[in-house]
Amino acid sequence: PGTLERLGLDPEVLHRTNPGLVVTRVTGFGQTGPYKDRPGFATQAEALSGFAAINGEPDGQPLLPPIALTDEVAALVAAFATMVAVHSGVGQVVDVNLIESMLQLMGPLVPLYGLRGEVQERLGAGIPYTVPRNTYRTSDGRWVAVSTSAESVAERVMDLIGLGDDPRFGDFSGRVAHRDLIDERMAEWMAARTMEQVLAEFEAAHAAVAPVYDMAD
C-alpha cells in the first residue's frame, strides 16, 4: 500500500488526467486496516484464510500448498474485477488483496462456522461430504483418484468394491460415519489391481476415477 502515492501516481491524480482510468491494486492485506503495512505473501494468506488448517492428515501439521496458489487466485480475481470495472465505463480503483482472494476459495466453510459453529477438520485427501474420496495405490505402483460426489455414483462404487449389500454404507451419513473402514476396503481393492484394471472396472461401472499424473505424464 502507498507505492503509487510515493511514485506520484495517486489514483486521484491519475483520474484528474483520465477520469475513465481503472487502477487495479493487489496487496497482501489491502489498502486499509490493521494489517495493511505488514509484509504479505501467498504463504501468509494461505495460513490466515484457514486454507492450511484444513489440509493435511488429522493428526499431522497443517499443510501449505506446494505452489503459490494464492498468487494465482488473486491474479484471477484481479483480472476479473478489472474487466468488470472496464466494462462499466466508470473510472475507479479495484482493490484486491491476497487474503480475501483465498477466503473466496473457502466457500461454505465461512458460513458453516458463522451459522453453526462448525470448524472443518483435516481429513487428508478426504472431504466431509463425500466418502470415498481419496487417492489410492494400485498393484503396479500407480495412483488413482476417486470421488463419489453423487449418491448414484457412491452406490455404484460400493457395489464395485463389494460393500453394496452392507446397510452401514447405504446412505451418505452411513458412509461418512464409516469413512476409515471404507477407505481401508477401497485401498485393499485397489492394491489387488493394476491401474489399467482399475480404470477399466470403474468405467464399466460408470463411476468417476482418474489416474494421478505428474508433468511427465
Q: Over which residues does each language-model region extend?
A:
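Aromatic-enriched alpha-helical interface/lid elements that frame and gate functional surfaces
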Residues: P132-V209
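Active-site-adjacent "lid/gating" segments in soluble enzymes
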Residues: E5-W143, S147-T148
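Short acidic, glycine-rich surface-loop motifs adjacent to enzyme active sites
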Residues: P1-T3
